[in-house]
Structure formats: C-alpha cells, structure tokens
Amino acid sequence: CGGNSAAGGPGFIPGLVRTIPPATVQQTHGLTSCSEWTGVSLSLLLDQAGVKPKGIWIIAEGEERGMHTKSIPIEKAMDDVLVVYGQNGEPIRPEQGYPLRLLVPGWEGINSVKWLRRIKVTHQPAMGMKEMTRYTRLLSNGKSHWFEFEMGPKSVITRPSGGQQLSGPGFYEIT
C-alpha cells in the first residue's frame, strides 16, 4: 500500500469515525515495520536470464486474489530490488508472502509483491486495475499521474509510545 502512516483514521476510510483514541504506534503510525530480509538480488537473476537493461519494464505477478501485478522500470529492478525468501532469520510466513516476495526498497509497499509467482520482462508496463485506478495521483488539471513509486525514509519513536508519560526530569532511552 502507499499509505505511509495511514492508520485507518478519518479520511483514510471514507465514513470511518474513530471512537477510541489511538494508543499504540501501529494505531497512530500504522503500516510501518522494520525487518531483516534474506534473498537474491533481482539484478543477478535478470543478468543470468540475459536481460539487457534498456528501456524495458519488469512486471511482478503475485498469487493474490485478482492476480496482483506491479510494473517496475528496469533501472530500479537492476538496482536494489530483491527476491526474498526470509524475514528476520526465518522463512517468510504465509501472511508476508511465502514462499517468495519482491522487496523494492524506498518505494511504496504495494510494489513489494507478495506470493511472487512470475516476473515478466516487457517493453511496456502492465495496465492492471490497481495501476490504473488506485495508485495514481490526480493532478489539478484533471489528468492522472501513473506510476507513483518513491516513498521517503521514515522514523517513528516507539518508546515512550501512545499514552505513556515520562515520570519526571531525568535520562530516558528513546527507541
């Protein structure tokens, strides 16, 4: 998803009214995580397949319902993208995309396709439903800008968190 800190509050889901004040980091800064990933560089796989990095796209296809696909320019695919099989020292869990998922650092999470089943190399991006309708930016002139990718780094203080209060003056560990 591209909802950087979209914790499901008002405005994120039309008509949602929050009745309980947020108390945890995921409630106030949801859709954030920190993991150590294990995998293979996509550029290594593409090199071994004989792909020439010029003016083409890769299309990552996942086993999600609706056959989730994302188009990624070859320049990014050959940079720091990984095909991952491990998270935090263990195999990826099913809810995180087992057995394989794409990891696209610095880009919206929707590009890190879970349950990866196929990677295609093409001369044009896929025009799937999500790419055409959900992950576009409407410009002031009424036109749409497709293929929004980058998402800047983010830091969140997790401790103290939510409703926690410091007991008074002194030294505290902030994490």
Briefly describe each language-model feature range:
Residues 1-175:
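Structured, non-membrane catalytic/scaffold regions adjacent to prosthetic-group chemistry
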